[in-house]
């Protein structure tokens, strides 16, 4: 049985999800072997008859919900104008998983993964219809001097691992395969900073959903069945004025962020300013909090005086991501903007759709 066939046959019990298939899938991914003993699947299928299970067709997502790693490379590129460029990118879509497996085998414990996304205009040019229901160009927010800017970007690569050499090697091979088809507009190498702190000293990603909740908040479901298992991702590159930030007393920094610096505890609502970062980036709908999955990474060049945060947020719809930016840059209410923006400037901004892993391979045939 081929890997693709197995992935599409996921046995779901009414009393819970059978997870044994994941161990087989992980084995196949590690070894690269495209066949396996079907006795496990046969056994699970027979159990489904007696335990009220249903076999459903659920696309495998890309590695959107992978744990935060120690290193990452973010590459944003534009598609070149030649017709051959589009053809090359489409064919390349089928090679991403294989290249990732090949490089990952060098350090099996390195947790190497790659997520690939496409902008609205790139999707239309590369794949046409149908298209993801909520995919559109990045929307700018804010006013002059405090703006979430939109910058060119047709293709996103988010490469993660616990070692930078794995990220570097995979990025090298992926970009080599795209030679002549794209032009890189931004590339950032991010690193884990102590106990998952941002470059400004506060823990980042504290409120990230995990497990099933992460999948619920990040992966498209029945609302757009053709693209189920996909995700929307928004990226921004922020530069920080570290001198001005470090001139603030710790207590003042905590009021800007809305959390304590050392212990990473959220300030009580009675003392947390309404324009603190945590207050304005908490999104609710119909009285319920809507989470996004952040995988931000610090980056910098101390010799050049450059210190930054690469923001990357995944969600099942662009809506909470854009609401967050509106709260930050316009303010809630308008004028009550995120105080962190007095020390941080967004210099890039793009929105992409991340197709499921299954669909990504199928797109090569369009």
Predicted regions located by residue number:
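Long, histidine/aromatic-enriched segments associated with O2/redox biology
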Residues: 41-44, 48-366
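Short, positively charged and aromatic/hydrophobic N-terminal segments
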Residues: 10-13, 20, 49
């Amino acid at each position: 049985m081929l890997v693709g066939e197995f992935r599409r046959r996921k046995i779901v019990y009414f009393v819970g999800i059978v997870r044994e298939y994941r161990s087989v899938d992980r084995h196949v991914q590690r070894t690269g072997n495209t066949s396996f003993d079907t006795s496990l699947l046969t056994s699970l299928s027979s159990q489904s008859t007696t335990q009220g299970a249903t076999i459903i067709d659920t696309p495998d997502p890309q590695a959107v919900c992978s744990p935060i790693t120690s290193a990452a490379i973010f590459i944003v590129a534009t598609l070149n104008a030649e017709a051959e460029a589009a053809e090359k990118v489409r064919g390349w879509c089928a090679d991403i998983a294989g290249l990732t497996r090949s490089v990952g085998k060098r350090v099996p414990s390195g947790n190497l993964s790659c997520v690939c996304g496409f902008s609205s205009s790139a999707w239309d040019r590369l794949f046409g219809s149908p298209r993801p229901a909520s995919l559109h160009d990045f929307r700018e927010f804010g006013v002059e001097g405090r703006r979430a800017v939109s910058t060119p970007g047709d293709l996103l690569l988010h490469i993660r691992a616990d070692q930078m050499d794995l990220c570097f090697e995979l990025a090298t091979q992926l970009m080599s395969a795209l030679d002549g088809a794209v032009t890189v507009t931004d590339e950032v190498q991010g690193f884990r900073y102590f106990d998952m702190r941002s470059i400004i000293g506060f823990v980042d990603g504290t409120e990230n959903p995990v497990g099933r909740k992460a999948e619920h908040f990040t992966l498209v479901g029945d609302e757009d069945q053709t693209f189920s298992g996909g995700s929307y991702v928004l990226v921004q590159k922020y530069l920080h004025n570290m001198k001005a930030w470090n001139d603030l007393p710790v207590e003042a920094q905590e009021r800007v962020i809305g959390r304590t610096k050392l212990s990473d505890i959220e300030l009580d609502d009675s003392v947390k300013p309404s324009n603190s970062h945590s207050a304005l980036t908490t999104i609710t709908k119909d009285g319920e909090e809507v989470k996004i999955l952040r995988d931000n990474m610090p980056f910098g060049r101390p010799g050049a005086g450059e210190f930054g945060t690469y923001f990357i947020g995944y969600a099942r719809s662009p809506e909470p991501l854009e609401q967050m930016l509106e709260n930050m840059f316009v303010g809630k209410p308008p004028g009550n903007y995120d105080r962190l923006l007095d020390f941080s400037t967004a210099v890039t901004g793009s929105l992409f759709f991340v197709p499921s892993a299954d669909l990504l391979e199928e797109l090569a045939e369009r």
